[in-house]
Amino acid sequence: MMRPILARGAARCASQCAPLRATVPPASRVLLGTSTWRPTRQYSIKAKAAESTKPQDLDSSKLTIEKTTKPKPLKKAEELVFGQTFTDHMLSIEWNKDAGWLAPKITPYQNLSLDPASSVFHYAFECFEGMKAYKDKAGQIRLFRPDRNMERLNKSAARIALPNFNPNTLLDLIAQLVKVDSRFIPEQRGYSLYLRPTMIGTQKTLGVGAPGSALLYVIASPVGPYYPTGFKAISLEATDYAVRAWPGGVGDKKLGANYAPCIVPQREAMSRGFQQNLWLFGEEQFVTEVGTMNMFVALRNKETGAKELLTAPLDGTILEGVTRDSVLSLAREKLAPEGWSIIERKYTMQELSDAADEGRFIEAFGSGTAAIVSPVRSISWKGKLVDCGLKAHEESGELATKMKNWIEARQYGDEEHEWSYTC
């Protein structure tokens, strides 16, 4: 079915691009490496363009709840290991192309029954989210910026031909699940209930195509603080021998297929004494992400000495992190009045090395849902360690500490803010 479409597209391109080619000087066509002329990209993929149908509304009024008859004992908070303890229940919603979204169900946590030919197993039709529920001092349950997670999950699903959904309805259903399993939310500061919404293609077929059926489910896991005894700065290996994402790819979507290929490079970095990879891209060695987090660096401008908080732009090669956006918003609100410049632009590993050599490197940290922020001590690059500004006795810079405190204040309801969603 695809070949006739591609043939027609090629024919259209030939007719449409002929006038463009005719206007390009011959020298530009030959000397692309030295000419300033570049061909214009004719097409690009956007989330909405990838949707085969309009979002089909979920119906929360059809929710059924079946509670477990064998509730699990609660673990002591200090015994919690990330992602290894799960609550009593899960939310699941089936979809098929004929009926759309079926009635949502909250049931006891259980195994899935899938055909071995399900498309998720063969062609990676899978996307997910990571978000958390918290208890404030009054025992009220709160979610942190869940609308951003719903938006991103829809974008990820659309990019791999999975169905979209009404984000407000799914958020309401997730809140219902959280309330059913509220006893699993630890009350101590730094603890939370990690939520994992996941969507998979379930159609029984070995053919490569958009799945005709899918499953959206949500599981929950009580977790402790990423740094239980306080910050512990990490060391990174600048990685250019493997690529996490590339222009026109899916590095900005939260797909499982983006994560598995990163494990071997991480193991290699760990074998050399580094905790994470700092992913570089291209001959210029642009800094993109750190491990599974967005990357921030604080530098002094070489010409003016002004303080700058710098992070890579949303160019399609990095994830649209919810914590990243929160850090940027807080920085513009609280740091900009103090003279900081908050900048989203491409920057290179050479820039960071030069800043360190010249004493202009203030600090660096990663940002993500699991840790909020993760301070960076040093980066291994081209056989040398690039110092990221921390003193020997320090495990965190001033900015990373402030960001963690500012974000936690809104997560736990100490500061009433629109980012906090009460269940």
Question: Predicted regions: what is each one?
Answer:
Residues 1-53:
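N-terminal mitochondrial targeting presequence
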Residues 3-5, 9, 44-177, 205-423:
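Helix-start/capping segments and mature chain N-termini
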Residues 36, 40, 168, 176-187:
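An exposure/low-complexity boundary signal
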Residues 180-183, 188-213, 224:
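Non-catalytic, conformational "gating/processing" segments within enzyme and secreted inhibitor domains
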